[in-house]
Structures are given as C-alpha cells and as structure tokens.
Amino acid sequence: MNSTEITQNTDVPSHFRSIKTFVLRTGRMTEGQKRNYEAFYQKWCIPYTESPIDFQTLFQNDNPVIIEIGFGMGTATAQIAEDNPDKNYLGIEVFKAGVGKLLGEIEEKKLNNLRIIEHDAIEVLENMINNESVDGFHIFFPDPWQKKRNHKRRLVRRPRTDLLSKKLKDGGYIYMVTDWENYAEDAFEQLSETPNLKSKYEKFAPSQSWRPTTKFEKKGLKKEHVINELIFEKD
C-alpha cells in the first residue's frame, strides 16, 4: 500500500461514523425505475466493498474523476456527464428510486463516463476511494438539517470535510450549492477551517453556467430562497 492509498476507517472518528447525514426514506419506485434497476444495475453500478477502486481500470482511461455525493434523481448528473465526455463521474446515492432513474439515463445516453455506488457516501469514501485520487466533489442541495441539534448531521461539516480534503488531489475542488443561507454560512466556515482547503472566491461563488438547474433548486427558488454556491480548492 503506497502513501496515497486508503487506511480503512481512520479518517472519521468512530463516534461520528454512527451519525448519518441522511434519512433513508422508503419511497416507492416507479415501474420504469424498477425495470432500470433490475436491468442495468450490474452494468453501471459498483457494489460496495471495503477494497479501493482503481479508477483507471474502472473507466479504462486516466481522465479526471469527479464524485457527486447525493445525486437525487440524477438528471443534472447525467447532463453534466454528457456535456463533459473527457471527465469521469461517480455518483453516490442511497435512494433506490434515484438510482433507478439515473440508470435509465446512463443506458439511454450511453454514458460510459458515469458509474453509481448505492451506499452511504462516508463509508464509500473511507473504504473505496484512495487518498489524493479525486479531482472534484459535487454536493448539490444536501439535506440542510435545519434544527441546531441536527447540524452535526450535515455532510459539509468537520470532520467529514477533512475526509473530502484527504481524498482530493492537489488542485482538486469541492463545489457545494445550497438554498439554505444558514447552511451556506456554516459550510463556508467549516470548509475554511479544513486543512489544505481555500475558497476560490472571497466568499460565495458566482453561479456556474455549466451546472444544470436541479429539482431542489427550482423548489428553493419558488420559496424565494437565495441560492448560494461555494467552491473550495485544495492547495
């Protein structure tokens, strides 16, 4: 094992590992999502294991790798992958309906540069992703966990941001978008305190034209929420 490879279960303290950043809802899958899941899971999904992924073997190239944590229904994920065939994308999601929906998009558009892992993202990062192997993280509209007592569950919070930083290559980035101002302020503070990360902008980033509008973004705008974007880079 070289110095850049993972050391299992050492990045996030044990008491934090029991704190989940999501609630596993049991929503129904549509018939189409079920068909996609059954037909294409083995083709486009990577089973969770405690062995690191070799991205060059997986994608059959050495293109940059971007990981999206919590892709929802995956519409924006598929669009970004389609628009950027020179980059590889790994989407991590726990909700079967979203996995089923995105599987259909991947198959229909033949997105050979996109794969899925259906599992808890923190465990995936700890056990399947080598240190200094990722070119970027996309975190679009994560659960804001609005009540103060639940802020510890937020994905963009230390020590989870320390874990993200360790997985990034030098020059890699974390791109977060949220419509909850309190979360944006908190995330900026947490990321600013994370070793080796620095904001690309004085504070919030301008809207990135290449990012498609998501369903959650439309809901936030309908409620007149302000969309805040953060981009931090590893130096």
From Swiss-Prot:
UniProt xrefs under Pfam families: Methyltransf_4 (PF02390)
E.C. designation(s): 2.1.1.33
Enzyme class at the top of the EC tree: transferase
SUPFAM superfamilies: S-adenosyl-L-methionine-dependent methyltransferases
Binding site for S-adenosyl-L-methionine: 68, 93, 120, 143
Binding locations of substrate: 147, 179, 214-217
Catalytic activity annotation: guanosine(46) in tRNA + S-adenosyl-L-methionine = N(7)-methylguanosine(46) in tRNA + S-adenosyl-L-homocysteine
InterPro entries assigned to the protein according to its UniProt record, in alphabetical order: SAM-dependent_MTases_sf, tRNA_(Gua-N-7)_MeTrfase_Trmb, tRNA_methyltr_TrmB_bact
Domain of life: Bacteria
Alphabetically ordered keywords of this record: Methyltransferase, S-adenosyl-L-methionine, Transferase, tRNA processing
Pathway: tRNA modification; N(7)-methylguanine-tRNA biosynthesis
GO MF terms, alphabetically ordered: tRNA (guanine(46)-N7)-methyltransferase activity
Family: Belongs to the class I-like SAM-binding methyltransferase superfamily. TrmB family.
NCBIfam families, A to Z: tRNA (guanosine(46)-N7)-methyltransferase TrmB
Function summary: Catalyzes the formation of N(7)-methylguanine at position 46 (m7G46) in tRNA.
Name assigned to this protein: tRNA (guanine-N(7)-)-methyltransferase
Organism: Treponema denticola (strain ATCC 35405 / DSM 14222 / CIP 103919 / JCM 8153 / KCTC 15104)
Gene: trmB
